[in-house]
Swiss-Prot record:
Transmembrane regions: 1-21
Keywords, ordered alphabetically: Host endoplasmic reticulum, Host membrane, Isoprene biosynthesis, Late protein, Magnesium, Membrane, Metal-binding, Transferase, Transmembrane, Transmembrane helix
Cofactor(s) needed for function: Mg(2+)
Species for this entry: African swine fever virus (isolate Tick/Malawi/Lil 20-1/1983) (ASFV)
Topology versus the membrane: Single-pass membrane protein
GO CC annotation, single: host cell membrane
Subcellular location: Host endoplasmic reticulum; Host membrane
Entry's Gene Ontology molecular function annotations: (2E,6E)-farnesyl diphosphate synthase activity; dimethylallyltranstransferase activity; geranylfarnesyl diphosphate synthase activity; geranylgeranyl diphosphate synthase activity; metal ion binding
Protein name per the record: Trans-prenyltransferase
Organism taxonomic ancestry: Viruses, Varidnaviria, Bamfordvirae, Nucleocytoviricota, Pokkesviricetes
Length: 318
């Protein structure tokens, strides 16, 4: 099934890249939405985590209502997406917001489509992770896993649908920018770059999933950080620095989870190997390095204190 997903990603990616490189700057490659995902939401207003989470839930509900998922896959995809913490889309939206306080493109960017994409990719990976051929989990987020509720076949196809829809969301984000942000530099080129980067990150996540390493966690944070940076600044300048911040945060997130699962994990749990105390020290060091990078790029805002504390709370079991 993973091979089918990867082949489908490659085919879609080729089509997207051809579209971006052979069409005029203002050519749409996606159909317009029938609803406004972000009605009543202003992207430049400062927000706390709770407000961001509620706003993203509104965006998600609107996207599902607008038909992001079709037919028999609507219910399992919607089911899988409910009840998350939405930390990845919140990170993406906040980075875009912070960047726009320094960069103007003629109109504020609403990164709703990109935020949906990163959550879709992440949830697709969770569905696969829970499958009988991987972790064989029957519970997640205090409810049945997708395969346990809907069956293996629908779970597999739901993961594929989420992944494919995520790429369409990225394309829709670029189309929206082309229509609403006249000073955004070369959106077609950045759209092709983002799709290529995301494809590479998903491949890394898939490889990490097979051997159960932090590389199944970190790539999704790289997608959130880097898409946020590129959409917020309109450039790939310093993208390596932002990727480093994402790596530090993703590493802290995974190790905090290892501490939480110390007593139940049977695989290569870092905290089991090195001890909880040392692992917690690495979590704190990684978060501190991430903070330093974000401060250096002037995108460390008050909500990061909440985000970092959530990671610490996982490690502390609170």
């Amino acid at each position: 099934m993973l091979h089918l997903i990867y082949i489908s990603i490659i085919v879609v990616l080729i089509i997207i890249l051809i579209s971006y490189t052979h069409k005029p700057k203002y050519f749409r490659i996606t159909a317009p939405r029938s609803v406004t995902l972000f009605h009543g939401i202003h992207p430049l207003n400062p927000k706390n985590y709770k407000t961001f989470s509620e706003e993203f839930e509104t965006i998600l509900n609107n996207a599902i209502e607008d038909g992001d998922f079709k037919g028999q896959l609507t219910e399992p995809c919607s089911y899988a997406l409910r009840g998350g913490k939405y930390i990845r889309p919140i990170i993406l939206m906040e980075i875009v917001r912070a960047c726009q306080l320094q960069h103007s493109f003629g109109a504020p960017i609403y990164p709703a489509e990109a935020a949906l994409a990163v959550e879709y990719f992440h949830v697709a990976s969770l569905i696969i992770d829970d499958m009988p051929s991987f972790d064989n989990d029957v519970k997640r987020r205090n409810k049945d896993t997708v395969w346990a509720r809907f069956g293996v076949a629908k779970a597999q196809m739901s993961a594929l649908a989420l992944t494919m829809q995520g790429f369409q969301n990225i394309c829709r984000q670029i189309d929206w920018i082309k229509e609403h942000c006249p000073r955004f530099p070369d959106p077609n080129q950045l759209g092709a770059l983002l799709c290529t980067f995301v494809s590479h990150s998903l491949n890394s996540a898939g490889s990490g999933q097979l051997v159960d390493t932090p590389e199944k966690t970190i790539p999704f944070f790289k997608i959130a950080f880097i898409m946020g940076w590129v959409l917020g600044t309109g450039t790939i300048e310093d993208i390596g620095v932002i990727e480093r911040a994402a790596h530090c945060f993703g590493n802290a997130f995974q190790l905090a989870d290892d501490i939480k699962d110390h007593d139940t994990d049977t695989g290569g749990n870092y905290a089991k190997i090195h001890g909880k105390r040392k692992t917690f020290d690495v979590v704190a060091q990684s978060l501190q390095e991430c903070k330093k990078i974000l401060q250096g790029k002037k995108i460390y805002t008050s909500i990061w204190n909440e985000i970092f504390q959530k990671v610490i709370n996982v490690a502390l079991g609170t």
